[in-house]
């Protein structure tokens, strides 16, 4: 009884164990194509020479400079004729000479222009002989062109560079400036009333020049300002007579001086 069970167990065990399967060597995998480097000869079809030639692919060629021309399959274009010793024969220089004249019967006479054609500016349009009037007209036109070119290039390319350097506004110029002298001379020519009753006399006219006070006038006005920032009408008339200024000029000077004093005090506070 036991023997039968053992035999049954051995049969079941042998049947449950899978037998190893052998994979043929030439099996193909359609979903996994073989990589290029796995092929036996991947680059043979792309090589210039299917067989290895040490004279062509060697690092140091043993056949000289002319050995490369010995392969017509590699150099099919313009191969020179090799001599028996493997050297390229020297080519004789060909001396090409231009024709002597236009009437020569040489086959290559049209390749080289004649000296007469080279002297003519436009061979296709110019006549054989130009008249003296045409030559004189051409000479006059050339002279006129040269004169106009010289006149043009004498001038500056940038017009603003031809003007004098800007020195500033005329009403800010010192006494030595010519523009300020002209404007002051025009204003000095006018006799302005001074003294009492000149509070409404306008000195600035259409010229819009700025009044330039002398050192003496500025000194006296500064002394008066330090005495009192606000000038009275009596003192204003006295200064007008003494400084040869109108009362309006003195009033405006004091207004500007008080504004300057306020700005200076604000700067000190900051």
Curated annotation (Swiss-Prot):
Keywords, comma-separated and alphabetical: Activator, Centromere, Chromosome, Developmental protein, DNA-binding, Homeobox, Kinetochore, Nucleus, Transcription, Transcription regulation
Taxonomic superkingdom: Eukaryota
Composition skew (Low complexity), residue ranges: 14-24, 101-130
Expressed in which tissues: Blastomeres. Embryo. Oocytes.
A GO CC term attached to the entry: nucleus
Chief site of localization: nucleus
Stretches the record annotates as Disordered: 1-24, 96-130, 175-201
Gene Ontology MF annotations: DNA-binding transcription factor activity, RNA polymerase II-specific; RNA polymerase II transcription regulatory region sequence-specific DNA binding
Phenotype upon loss of function: Embryos shows disorganization of cell types and lack specification. Loss of V6 rays development in male tail. C and D blastomere derived muscle.
Signal peptide: none
UniProt cross-references to PROSITE patterns, sorted A to Z: HOMEOBOX_1 (PS00027), HOMEOBOX_2 (PS50071)
Keyword Iron found: no
Family annotation (Pfam families): Homeodomain
Subcellular localization, as worded in the UniProt entry: Nucleus; Chromosome, Centromere, Kinetochore; Chromosome
Ranges of the DNA-binding region feature: 206-265
Induction details: By heat shock.
One GO BP: muscle cell fate commitment
Function recorded in the entry: Transcriptional activator. Interacts with promoter regions for tbx-8.9, tbx-9, elt-1, hnd-1, scrt-1, and vab-7 genes. Binds the sequence ATTTATGAC. Binds to the enhancer region of the hlh-1 gene promoter during embryonic body wall muscle development. Activates the gene for mab-5 in embryo development. Necessary for vab-7 expression in C blastomeres in the posterior of embryos. Required for posterior V6 neuroectoblast cell fate specification during postembryonic neurogenesis (patterning) which generates the characteristic ray lineage during male tail development.
Quaternary data: Interacts with tir-1 and let-756.
PANTHER family: HOMEOBOX PROTEIN CDX, HOMEOTIC PROTEIN CAUDAL
Family statement drawn from the similarity comment of this UniProt entry: Belongs to the Caudal homeobox family.
Miscellaneous: Fifth intron is thought to contain a regulatory element required for expression in postembryonic neuroblast V6 cells. 3'-UTR thought to inhibit self-translation in anterior blastomeres.
Protein name per Swiss-Prot or TrEMBL: Homeobox protein pal-1
Species in which this protein is naturally found: Caenorhabditis elegans
